[in-house]
Amino acid sequence: MAVCARGLRCLGTPAVSLRLAASRSYATTTPPDPAIPNTPGAAATSSPAKRPRTSFQDKLNAGPSFSDFLSDKDDARILDPAEAYALKTALVGPKGKKKEYTRLPPWLKTSIPDSNNYKRIKNDLRGLNLHTVCEEARCPNISECWGGGSKSAATATIMLMGDTCTRGCRFCSVKTSKAPPPLDPHEPENTAEALSRWGLGYVVMTSVDRDDLPDGGARHWAETVMKIKQKAPNILVECLTGDFDGNLEMVALVAKSGLDVYAHNVETVEALTPQVRDRRAGFQKSIRVLKAAKAAQPSLITKTSMMLGLGETEEQMWDALRQLRAADIDVVTFGQYMRPTKRHMPVHEYVRPDVFEFWKEKALEMGFLYCASGPLVRSSYKAGEAFIENVLKKRRAESTGPGSASVQDVATGDLVR
C-alpha cells in the first residue's frame, strides 16, 4: 500500500483520496474515528484503539506460567496414590436429564496414533486387503504397537478370515453376521507377504469366529502359518484362535501347523461367561481347546487372557487361575475391560493398577511361565512378546532337529485330506 501511495503522490494525487478508495475496496478496513481529523498527519500519528481487558485475561495473567506446569519443584502438587487413583465423575446430558458418568482414569489414556511406522503399516494392510484386530476391536494400544520407535519395533495383529464374526460377544466391537463373506483364498499368501516386509521376529495373528464353515476356518489358519514359515523360517508365530465350536481335531490341525504359541482366551471368570461371551462359547470349552493344543504339540506355549472390571469377585479370580494352571497353560494376561460403544455392556469397575500388579504376582507364584498384567494390557499386546520370544529362541537352540519340519509335514497331510 505504501508503494502505491508513493506512486500516486508522484502523479499529484492526494493521499486522502487513496485512503477513501481503499476503504471502499476493502469491506474489512476499519473506518476512521470521527473524533480524529481526516488529514494525512492524523492518519500517520493515530494508533488502533485497545481492546478492553477481560476478567478471564486477568485470571490468566495472574495464574501459573507454562514453565510452572513443566516444573516438578513444587512437591505439594505431587499426588499420593489415593489421590492419583481417585475416579472423577461428570454430569452429562441436557438440562433436567443429566446423568452421572465416571470419567476415564488417567492411567487409561493414550496418545493419538501419528507416526511414519503407523502410516506405513496402515498402507501395507490396505494394499494387501488385510484386517487387524487393532482397528476392528478399537485397541487403545494401536499408537504404541503400530508406531514403534523403529521398523522392527512396530507390529500389528493380523485378523484372518475377514472382518465379520458369526458370534456376538457383549464386549467386542467386531462386526457380526450369520452369513459373512466367503474366505479370501489369497489371504494366507498376502499375510505372509506383509509380515515378511515388516522384518519382525515375533508376530501375532487372530481371527473372527466362522461357525458357518465346516472346519471353523482351521485349514485356512494352518495354510497361513505354513506360508509365513516358508517366507520367513525364523519368525516366531503366535496364533490367537477361536474354539472351532469345540472340534478338537481342528484344534490339533492348527497346533501342528508350525506355530510357536497357541493362544485362546477365556475372556472372563467362569461365573460371568454367560453374560459376557456369546452363548456358543464356554469357559470349560475354552479350557478343553487349550488342553487339546498342548496334547497335540507338547512343545507349544499355551496362552490365555482375561478382562477385569466386569464385576468379577476375588474368589472367582482365584478359581479361574486354579483351573487355568491345572490345564497346564503357560502364559496368562490381565487387562481392563473398556466399553467400545454404548451398545456394549457397561464397565462395572475401573480396576486400579496396583490390583493388576497383585494378580500378576499371584499368577507367577502359582507357576505360570509369564504374566502380563495392567490396565492397557491386551491378549495380543506386545509387552510380553520379548519375554516369550527369548524363551522360544532358547528352546529352539537347545533342541534343534527335524521336529519343526515333521510338524509341517503332518499339517500338510491333514490339509490335503
UniProtKB/Swiss-Prot annotation:
Its cofactor is [4Fe-4S] cluster. Keywords: 4Fe-4S, Iron, Iron-sulfur, Metal-binding, Mitochondrion, S-adenosyl-L-methionine, Transferase, Transit peptide. It is found in: Mitochondrion. Binds 2 [4Fe-4S] clusters per subunit. One cluster is coordinated with 3 cysteines and an exchangeable S-adenosyl-L-methionine. GO terms for cellular component: mitochondrion. It holds the Pfam family Radical_SAM. The keyword Glycosyltransferase does not apply. Pathway: Protein modification; protein lipoylation via endogenous pathway; protein N(6)-(lipoyl)lysine from octanoyl-[acyl-carrier-protein]: step 2/2. HAMAP family: Lipoyl_synth. Belongs to the radical SAM superfamily. Lipoyl synthase family. This is Lipoyl synthase, mitochondrial.
